[in-house]
Amino acid sequence: MPKMIFRNHEVKNLDQFLLLDLSRSFGVEPQIEEVQSEPVCPVPDMREVQEEVELFRKSWEEEQVQLRARAEREAQDLKERVEEEITAYREQCTQEADRILAQAKEQSELQISEAQQQAERMIAEAETSRQKICDHSKAEGIRLGKEEGFRAGQEEVRYLTERLHKMIEEVMGRRQGILRETERQIVDLVLLMTRKVVKVISENQRAVISANVVHALRKVRTRGAVTLRVNLADVELVTQHKQEFIAAVERVDDLTVVEDTSVGRGGCVVETDFGEIDARVASQLHELEQRVLEVAPIVVSSMSASKGS
């Protein structure tokens, strides 16, 4: 029960006043507007919510399966189109290379034939000169004496023989030089044609960048996210088909496409946590050139050996 009676020393007078609200108002009370209650929607049953969630989940999973199947079909179609185009261009390049090689071989055979004809003419002229000198020496020997004429004839014959051998060596050396020069020209023509064809294909065929990206991503050995560096002109195309590239390979969970000015059109560089995979067109072309240059000396040697035998 609260204390109701206080002593004098328990009370302290204050200058401030505290006004207390009346428990009852003596003014005109405002009219309270009656508000009509709105119907409350019934709370759904938890089982119905779970069933709806389960139906949504199944629908979402079916949609994901359909999207994945469609992406795999599109990736397979893209791969087949790329392989067909690459095969067609490879056949075209092979035919062009065969044509150039045939022309170069025909020119080299013509030069070799001319050199052989010139050597035969020189040998015939030398033989004619030798015979004339022998006849002259013989006649001179008869006039001056058999022994002196025979010695003079031997000297002339030895001189002509040495000269003839030198001429033959010069002709053979020229023939080998023609073979080496022709082989070098053939290799240069093939490499030049390859560079031009690859440059045109890389800049004008959108399927080249797609094929290079899929080929490079399939070399990734560990699962995770990777970064793909491409040329500025290929960024938009690669970004549009990013999900198709991910669906076409197994170990790539996420793909980030960035611009790199050091990467030529049609090529790419894949960066992973364990290193990078270089699929630039220039790198592939350089590897092809090295292989051609490694084979070229063998071709020259085999041609020289066959001609010598």
Swiss-Prot record:
GO terms for biological process: bacterial-type flagellum organization; protein transport. The keyword Transport applies. It is found in: Cytoplasm. GO terms for cellular component: cytosol. The keyword Thylakoid does not apply. Keywords: Bacterial flagellum biogenesis, Bacterial flagellum protein export, Cytoplasm, Protein transport, Transport. Belongs to the FliH family. Needed for flagellar regrowth and assembly. This is Flagellar assembly protein FliH. It comes from Treponema pallidum (strain Nichols). The lineage of its organism: Bacteria, Pseudomonadati, Spirochaetota, Spirochaetia, Spirochaetales. The gene is fliH.
